[in-house]
Amino acid sequence: MKIFICEDDPKQRENMVTIIKNYIMIEEKPMEIALATDNPYEVLEQAKNMNDIGCYFLDIQLSTDINGIKLGSEIRKHDPVGNIIFVTSHSELTYLTFVYKVAAMDFIFKDDPAELRTRIIDCLETAHTRLQLLSKDNSVETIELKRGSNSVYVQYDDIMFFESSTKSHRLIAHLDNRQIEFYGNLKELSQLDDRFFRCHNSFVVNRHNIESIDSKERIVYFKNKEHCYASVRNVKKI
């Protein structure tokens, strides 16, 4: 899940980035901060190009010609089930969300740092749970990666390729911005759907995320700049 932050106070914006990055790293959630900016139009442009569900943390009072609530209303046109969270120091402005019919997940008051951190994490947990529920309805395709006592849910679109691990019965999922080791086997993963193809004894690739293929060297390059290898027999089948 991609996370967007629109906050015109640089210190506050950096604080939110730190809170979210630490949460993602510690909890190993399939999330990333796609954009942190003071420009609402940059966020809106990203929302227009979204092909999955986003999570948006928006300051209500921005130093531009568009406020956070109006931005949320515009985002709704392109990401109707996205998670919109307003961050503000002005509780009296929350009524505007009903005027604009934004359907916000939460309002976080940023004057209390401890409360800010707790509420941001609560929102991320809720957004993650919603994503899992939507995936059960086939709205978003995800896979459960089992890591012993816990699991991580990852969207198909975030997967570059799977690789066999040096550890027995384990694989490594190469995602857009990180790697996850989990229990599984490549044969099952190659049968998820047509986009996943076993190009080598050690690799299953996501065809949708391939940038290019060097057929001579049998190297597959991905959108995140990683690469893997293909066998002589399978390189032309990718």
Curated annotation (Swiss-Prot):
CDD domains: REC_LytTR_AgrA-like (cd17533). GO terms for cellular component: cytoplasm. The keyword Transmembrane does not apply. Residues 2-125 form the Response regulatory domain. The keyword Phosphoprotein applies. The modification 4-aspartylphosphate is found at D59. Its main location: cytoplasm. One of its GO terms (molecular function) is DNA binding. Required for high-level post-exponential phase expression of a series of secreted proteins. This is Accessory gene regulator protein A. It comes from Staphylococcus aureus. The gene is agrA.
